[in-house]
């Protein structure tokens, strides 16, 4: 939960969330831990009817562009997600996640587009890959190809898929 920051909560409002591993240690460096994170993010998204617009799993932190779920506070959504992943991945570690997270309300298409680009370029900026499409642990390839990964991404591709399947 962010301390000392005002949060403007509104159903369906869009949030750019960043949270880190305990002491910013690279607990997410291996593919196994990233796969667990993606799987639990999708389960939590489904359970609370949240819409994920973008994400990236970095070695020591996570970025999400997500809406305020309709039936639960975003803080409760994140608590549920972090507790579940922590139980699954913690092992002998004292703590898996930092307690706090950063939350920035996003309004307008320009701000949304900037955050989307920032999230997808994060692995390139860090030198993990040469281009966003080479990084497996983000929503970039969904936007580039429309292929659904482990986490359902809210996009034009997804909306088109829903319309096609609901009319059948």
Each model region followed by its residue ranges:
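Short catalytic/metal-binding and nucleic-acid-binding patches
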Residues: 1-168
């Amino acid at each position: 939960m962010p301390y000392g920051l005002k949060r403007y909560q509104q159903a369906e409002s869009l949030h750019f969330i960043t949270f880190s591993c305990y002491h910013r240690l690279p607990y997410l460096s291996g593919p196994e831990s990233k796969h667990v994170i993606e799987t639990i993010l999708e389960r939590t998204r489904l359970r609370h009817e949240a819409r994920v617009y973008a994400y990236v799993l970095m070695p020591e932190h996570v970025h999400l562009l997500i809406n305020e779920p309709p039936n639960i506070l975003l803080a409760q959504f994140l608590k549920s997600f972090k507790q579940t992943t922590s139980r699954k991945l913690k092992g002998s570690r004292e703590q898996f996640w930092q307690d706090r997270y950063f939350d920035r309300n996003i309004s307008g298409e320009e701000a949304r587009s900037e955050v989307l680009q920032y999230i997808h370029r994060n692995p390139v900026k860090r030198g993990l890959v040469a281009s966003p499409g080479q990084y497996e642990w983000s929503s970039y390839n969904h936007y580039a190809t429309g292929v659904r990964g482990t986490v359902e991404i809210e996009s034009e591709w997804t909306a088109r898929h829903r319309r096609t399947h609901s009319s059948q």
